[in-house]
Amino acid sequence: MNMITFMLLLSLTLSIILTTINFWLAQMNPDAEKLSPYECGFDPLGSARLPFSIRFFLVAILFLLFDLEIALLLPLPWAIQLSQPLLTLLWTSILLLLLTLGLVYEWIQGGLEWAE
């Protein structure tokens, strides 16, 4: 058995054992104190479980999408050196066009407006 297979089996076995022990030893008796929000040791001034703005959530999701776009485009200089650089540039252009159209759509729909 080669070393990679051994390490994969060892990590899988260890993960399964630790997860099983965690579920077996965990205390499953939540009370009001455990379910209350923690605010750095101070008594909460109000309800700490207030909903946050949907606009904030939308802007955060858009940030994650465009951050992922940057991560997908980072290996582009090395991908151009492959056997078919035109195909690589075509797929890159399609990805950029799709994300740009999505951004324009969100802008037109008013999804990027912070205040209404």
Swiss-Prot record:
It is found in: Mitochondrion membrane. Gene3D superfamilies: NADH:ubiquinone/plastoquinone oxidoreductase, chain 3 (1.20.58.1610). The keyword Membrane applies. It catalyses: a ubiquinone + NADH + 5 H(+)(in) = a ubiquinol + NAD(+) + 4 H(+)(out). InterPro entries: NADH_UbQ/plastoQ_OxRdtase_su3 (IPR000440), NDAH_ubi_oxred_su3_sf (IPR038430). Pfam families: Oxidored_q4. GO terms for molecular function: NADH dehydrogenase (ubiquinone) activity. GO terms for cellular component: mitochondrial membrane; NADH dehydrogenase complex. The chain crosses the membrane at residues 6-26, 56-76, 85-105. The keyword NAD applies. Its EC number is 7.1.1.2. It is a multi-pass membrane protein. Belongs to the complex I subunit 3 family. Core subunit of the mitochondrial membrane respiratory chain NADH dehydrogenase (Complex I) that is believed to belong to the minimal assembly required for catalysis. Complex I functions in the transfer of electrons from NADH to the respiratory chain. The immediate electron acceptor for the enzyme is believed to be ubiquinone. PANTHER family: NADH-UBIQUINONE OXIDOREDUCTASE CHAIN 3. This is NADH-ubiquinone oxidoreductase chain 3. The lineage of its organism: Eukaryota, Metazoa, Chordata, Craniata, Vertebrata.
